[in-house]
Amino acid sequence: MALETTPWNVQDHLQTPEECVLYLEAVFEEARDDPAFIAKAIGDVARARGMTQTARAAGISREGLYKALSEEGNPSFGTVLKVLTALGLRLQVELEAT
């Protein structure tokens, strides 16, 4: 008998701002050396919160935002900061545990 599975979409699990923050914190912790993965994760949050609204608030075209935050995208640091601000988030720096 074949095992039946259902598609899993991360955006379905990013319903609150707190869930979005926890998701991005985990991504930054686990994939700190993978900018493409981090950009895609920010894109996941933007899609969960509404890509059109996020793009408008960031001052970026919707298509440009999809492209920048895709797996093949390579957003500028400025774009990342604009998107985080549009999502009501901010980048925070802390000391690495030694």
Locate predicted features.
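Amphipathic alpha-helical interface surfaces
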Residues: 20, 34, 38, 42, ...
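Short alpha-helical DNA-recognition segment
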Residues: 47-67
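DNA major-groove recognition helix of helix-turn-helix/homeodomain DNA-binding modules
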Residues: 76-94
